[in-house]
From Swiss-Prot:
Source organism of the structure: Prochlorococcus marinus (strain MIT 9313)
Subunit structure: Homodimer.
Main subcellular location of this protein, as a coarse class: cytoplasm
Compartments reported by the entry: Cytoplasm
Main function: Catalyzes a salvage reaction resulting in the formation of AMP, that is energically less costly than de novo synthesis.
GO molecular function, one term: AMP binding
Full protein name: Adenine phosphoribosyltransferase
Name of the gene: apt
Phylogenetic placement of the source organism: Bacteria, Bacillati, Cyanobacteriota, Cyanophyceae, Synechococcales
A Pfam family this chain is assigned to: Pribosyltran
Coiled coil: none
NCBIfam families: apt (TIGR01090), PRK02304.1-3 (NF002634), PRK02304.1-5 (NF002636)
Domain of life of the source: Bacteria
A biological process from GO: purine ribonucleoside salvage
Keyword GTP-binding: no
EC number: 2.4.2.7
Length: 172
């Protein structure tokens, strides 16, 4: 099933010159969403993760649905100050500034096999930082899954070459 027709292009959002790829129509379409879960579920069958890690915020939507579907746990990676208790964090650079991501310090104890999921792979900065955070927390990253990849922005090249990356929709 081709999922592209369920992605809405929103020009000039969140600022002029940006073409935002909105997954909201995909989320509303039960057949389309089922196809997302099937394809990412196939990735889980292949890679056998113990946990799904999702990046705030749309990665939570994809990740919790997939984790529930596969009957495995979910771990959120959040913006700073959103998780109670002890956390591990990583600072990373953006095109125009910097940001920080955090994970519970004990979330990946025991070196679980981790699949990282998010709605979008663009420049790869956030995904790369999350990969580093997973490793810092003790997880064994076995793969990455994305609903959309903006290939022209080179995000895939920011991820470890030995890690399988699956994107369901690729825009060149």
């Amino acid at each position: 099933m081709d999922l592209r027709h369920l992605i809405q292009d929103v020009p000039d959002f969140p600022k002029p010159g940006i073409l935002f790829r909105d997954i909201s129509p995909l989320l509303r379409d039960p057949d389309g969403w089922d196809e997302v879960m099937r394809q990412l579920g196939d990735l889980c069958t292949e890679l056998k993760p113990d946990l799904i890690v999702g990046i705030e915020s749309r990665g939570f939507i994809v990740g919790t649905a997939l984790a529930t579907n596969r009957k495995i746990g979910f771990v959120p990676v959040r913006k700073p100050g959103k998780l109670p208790g002890d956390v591990l964090g990583i600072d990373y650079s953006l095109e125009y500034g910097s940001d920080r991501l955090e994970i519970h310090a004990d979330a990946l104890q025991g070196h679980p096999r981790v699949l990282l999921v998010d709605d979008l792979l663009a420049t790869g900065g956030t995904a790369r930082a999350t990969v580093e955070l997973i490793e810092k927390a003790g997880g064994d990253l076995v793969g990455c899954g994305f609903v959309i990849e903006l290939a022209a922005l080179g995000g895939r090249q920011q991820l470890p070459v030995e890690i399988p990356v699956k994107s369901l929709i690729i825009y060149s």
